[in-house]
């Protein structure tokens, strides 16, 4: 057997908690205010490798609560858009560039999570899942999926990818946030099933835990999409530096050539939507 030892939990000033000092935190009150999963996720994310002491304040649990809200809201959006979806697995022949990107990122996340589990890097697991779900799945893929869902040719497979990535994300989050993930997972199961090859278990807690799978590795496409995301971020930064209202569209010129120009041509609709761009023209690099 193995024993996991974490650092001493101190108050926000770094002092040892004690009833005589009146600086203790009652977990029951935290659960009442922020929720059980928020408490679990926050404390997990604060675990440092090496057993350093942990400073905790009441406000820090807002981090876990906000993430739980993000999971809930994103899941509601996905479920609202699963209407009419079949119970088939993802059609690999119909994957778009951004579909391959999110599947690759999910695959890499599963690898990192499993590797960290072996080393008992509990805090790293929480941060990895937070960054993937909030930034890559919600902020990028879900926003682009809204565009693909409007295309009759892409809708069905986009629904399958949305569902699959959410399913795998819930499985990885479940050990940390068991209550919200189980409820969402059961709702998805009732609405559409999972389009999975495996027999779907009765509960998330006994579902297979995601592992790295070479089948979902798309490193080239991931690199190409990262170029697109950096371009969108740059356009947003330029807009902000010139105080251009978020409601206003702008015309842009992108200087690129060769393979990169082909990539931008494939995902031009995403740039229009996410960077509030009207017309895009291309010029060769000087």
Where are these regions (language model features)?
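Short helix- or helix-capping micro-motifs
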Residues: 35
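Transmembrane helix-loop junctions at the membrane interface of multipass transporters and ion channels
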Residues: 49-52
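Feature 926 captures the class I aminoacyl-tRNA synthetase adenylation module centered on the KMSKS loop
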Residues: 1-32, 55, 59-286
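Non-catalytic, structured segments within soluble enzyme domains
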Residues: 41-42
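Structured mid-domain segments that build the active-site/substrate or prosthetic-cofactor binding neighborhood
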Residues: 45
């Amino acid at each position: 057997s193995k024993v996991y030892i974490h650092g001493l939990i101190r108050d926000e000033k770094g002092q040892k908690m004690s009833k005589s000092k009146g600086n203790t935190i009652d977990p029951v009150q935290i659960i009442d205010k922020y929720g059980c999963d928020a408490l679990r996720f926050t404390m997990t994310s604060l675990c440092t490798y090496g057993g350093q002491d942990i400073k905790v304040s009441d406000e820090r649990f807002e981090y876990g609560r906000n993430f739980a809200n993000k999971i809930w809201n994103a899941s509601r959006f996905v479920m609202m858009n699963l209407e009419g979806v079949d119970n088939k697995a993802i059609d690999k022949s119909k994957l778009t560039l951004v579909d391959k990107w999110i599947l690759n990122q999910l695959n890499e996340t599963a690898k990192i999570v499993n590797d960290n589990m072996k080393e008992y890097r509990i805090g790293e697991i929480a941060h990895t899942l937070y960054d993937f779900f909030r930034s890559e799945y919600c902020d990028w893929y879900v926003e682009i999926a809204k565009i693909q869902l409007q295309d009759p040719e892409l809708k069905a497979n986009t629904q399958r990818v949305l569902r699959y990535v959410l399913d795998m994300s819930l499985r990885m989050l479940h050990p940390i946030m068991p209550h919200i993930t189980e409820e969402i997972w059961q709702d998805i199961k009732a609405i559409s099933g999972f389009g999975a090859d495996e027999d779907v278990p009765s509960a998330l807690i006994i579902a297979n835990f995601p592992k790295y799978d070479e089948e979902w590795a798309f490193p080239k496409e991931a690199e190409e999409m990262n170029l697109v995301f950096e371009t969108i971020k740059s356009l947003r930064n330029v807009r902000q530096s010139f105080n251009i209202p978020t409601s206003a569209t702008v015309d842009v010129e992108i200087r690129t050539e060769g393979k990169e120009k082909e990539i931008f041509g494939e995902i031009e609709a995403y740039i229009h939507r996410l960077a509030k761009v009207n017309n895009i023209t291309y010029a060769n690099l000087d």
